[in-house]
Curated annotation (Swiss-Prot):
Keywords for the protein's UniProt record, in alphabetical order: Cytoplasm, Ribonucleoprotein, Ribosomal protein, RNA-binding, rRNA-binding, tRNA processing
Record-level GO BP terms: ribosome biogenesis; translation; tRNA 5'-leader removal
Assembly, per entry: Part of the 50S ribosomal subunit. Probably part of the RNase P complex.
Protein name: Large ribosomal subunit protein eL8
Domain of life of the source: Archaea
Amino acid sequence: MSKPIYVRFEVPEDLAEKAYEAVKRARETGRIKKGTNETTKAVERGLAKLVVIAEDVDPPEIVMHLPLLCDEKKIPYVYVPSKKRLGEAAGIEVAAASVAIIEPGDAETLVREIVEKVKELRAKAGV
C-alpha cells in the first residue's frame, strides 16, 4: 500500500519504535498533548518539542495540515505506522492520529536522537 499524501519522508521501523517509546516516557515523566486538535494547538502556540503523526489516519485530511504547520513553526515531526499503537503509547484506550510532546521528561535524550535522525531523513528526501 502506498503512503498517504501527507507522509513526506520514509521513517525506518527502528525510528518509529523510538517515537512510540518517547511518547510513552514523556507521558509518564513529562507532558504530552493527545489527538489532532490538542496537537494542532500545541504547534500553533510553539509549545511542542516533537510531533508524532500516524500514517494510517483515515480520512487523511485529519492530519494533512500538521507537517506544513510544523514546518512553519520549525517544530520537528516524525511518522509512525499505527494510530492504535500511538494511542496506546499516549495512554489512551482509543487510537490517536497525532501526539505532541510538550515536555519530554525522561525522554529528552530519545527526543533529541529522533530529531537528529529526522533531519537526516528529510535532507535525503529533499523536504
